[in-house]
Amino acid sequence: MKCYTQLTEGLYLGNQFSTSIITEINVIVSIGCKSKSTIPSIVNYKVSVRDSVDSDLTPLFGDVTEFIHINLSNNKKVLVHCQGGVNRSPIFAIAYLARYIMTLEEAVLHVSTLRSTVRIQPHYLHQLEKWLNDIIICKNQTNKL
């Protein structure tokens, strides 16, 4: 299994070792670990979160998915990674896909099909589902005004 997987045009998912292997990356989103990239031209976005049942990712989904979206919209190549590339980074990649491209169910299936080592913790998936529902409610309320 490669240490990284291409999910869409410009979006990659990987583990801690992928930061030093993918040469065409412009932006690295590091979830809970340090990027090993020392190339000055690469933008490093650090998200501090432990992989724990006590971790609440909800406040992070908005900023991280928007950051990914802005960079992909500017034709940047974005790598989202955590230590193992199994749980935390996949949930943020899924959050991006579900917010901007496809349904949550489609995003989970897409990512887990392309990267068979993905094992999303149920509490993270629940947090993401609630966050996405809150976005829909906010949009509906705004449209009524």
Question: What residue spans do the PLM features occupy?
Answer:
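Intrinsically disordered, low-complexity regulatory segments in eukaryotic proteins
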Residues: 144-145
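A eukaryotic "domain-to-IDR transition" signal
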Residues: 89-91, 136-140
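Cysteine-based protein phosphatase catalytic domain of the PTP/DSP
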Residues: 1-78, 98-136
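A phosphate-binding catalytic loop at a beta-strand-loop-alpha-helix junction
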Residues: 75-94
